[in-house]
């Protein structure tokens, strides 16, 4: 009986030692699982960082904290087609005739200090305060209800995260029109202003550009 047990034990060792494919497969799967867990953990950490930075940015916008807002910019900003200038000078008596849209005009730190309220308008402030950050984190998108700007314009804001290029997009959609005799808004046209921010590797948001449509 004792001899039989020794033979069985030796057979078991031999069998395990001669099944390298099973051992190798288990090792490969273990490495793959660890790599996947590492990627997931890094993404979770990045998500926690950028969503907190978004909340800090939103608070700075609401509080009109210019010094805090400046950390989200790298000056000078060179915006395609000078569209940042189109926004800040839209309702201004300032004359912007130095260059055309084909030549980029730097938007400096001093320009930001002067025009930041034109950049972050009342519509931007009202909209971003209504973006649900928990929803944005979970679904990578969130949007507001339609809000009134004035008697001929309403608007809404949407926030989306594009994970392919790590970009946060804050988009204000404007609808122009009129209210009929029943108070129903009849849309005649629409336009949008896109505020694009890069989500950096440390989770900090950095302003990239403004794009205008419509």
Give the residues covered by each predicted segment.
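Positively charged n-region of N-terminal signal peptides that target proteins for export
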Residues: 1-4, 18
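Hydrophobic helical h-region of N-terminal Sec-dependent signal peptides
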Residues: 6-10
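C-terminal motif of bacterial Sec signal peptides marking the signal peptidase cleavage site
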Residues: 14-15
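Bacterial Sec signal peptide processing site at the extreme N-terminus
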Residues: 18-28
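Elongated, non-catalytic scaffold/linker segments and compositionally distinctive motifs
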Residues: 33-35, 66
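C-terminal-biased regions
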Residues: 35-53, 71-214
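Short helix-adjacent coil turns
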Residues: 56-68
